[in-house]
Each structure stands twice: as structure tokens, then as C-alpha cells.
Amino acid sequence: LALPDALEEEYTIPEIAVEFELQKSYPSFEEFENYSDLDCDWDDYDDELEKLGVDADRDAENHKLLGYADTIQGEMLTECECVSRGLYCGDAESYENTPDEVKADIEKHAGDWMLLLQLSPVTKGGFEWMFGDCGMLYFYIRKDDLAARKFDKIHFSLQCC
């Protein structure tokens, strides 16, 4: 697809160099708590991350390809599975009213999803790219779909403060 000829400059995104760097990635406490068999409270989890050298005040510009998301409003694996089944996720009440056997199956398959790409705000020169109020864009994919390169099966989510 080509861009329209009359596209105003304010609606374009400049070319920005990207550098890749291998980093360790850890799940959020909520994701760890939901999908781990270990019994752990927030303080213990936070202490362990600190021992591993994880900075709780991560850099605001933290794009990721794979790994675990730096969530703002909570883990999204359950949301991905719900939406893939056509369930509404606009409020907590919808999930609470889902039958228990369906919730159990959703929770069983939520772990099939993984972060594909996380995009955070960018400030370069005079250019600023923001998503809501300091938000991030998240693209999730099922592990099997990634292996099969089915990128049309991606789930997108925006979280912001």
C-alpha cells in the first residue's frame, strides 16, 4: 500500500534507527502469579527481581521483540484468549459472568499466548510518538501461530496510565 500523496507531515512517522540488544525478561507479578505453581507474594517477588538486578523503574523507552511485556494495567494473556473466543473484555463483569468451565479452559489456554512485540513511546529530536498517557502497544501471538508464521493471528492491545 502506498501512502496518500496529500498526507500532511504531522501524520507521518520518520525513519528511526533501531538497535537490538539481548536482555533478560521477567514476567510481571500478576502473570507469574496466574501461570506459576509457586506460592509467592508481591514483596517476595519484588525482592527476588531486585536480587537479579532488575530495575523496578524501567526505562520509559523499552521496545521488545519477544520476552515478557512490561505491563501497565495488568497481564494480557487471559485477555488474548478471551478475545480469540469472541468474549467481550471491556469490563471485569463480563469475565466474572463467564461460566466456570469456560473460565477454566480460558486459563488453561491463556499460556499458549506470548508477547511478539512491545512498542513504547519514542522521543527523537523534535519527534514524539506517544500512545495515550505514556502507554505502550502490545502485539501477542499464540506460540503455535508464531512457529507457523501466522502473523494474521496477532492480538493487539494498548495499555496506558
Question: Where are the model-predicted features located?
Answer:
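Preference for intrinsically disordered or flexible, low-complexity segments
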Residues: 1-161
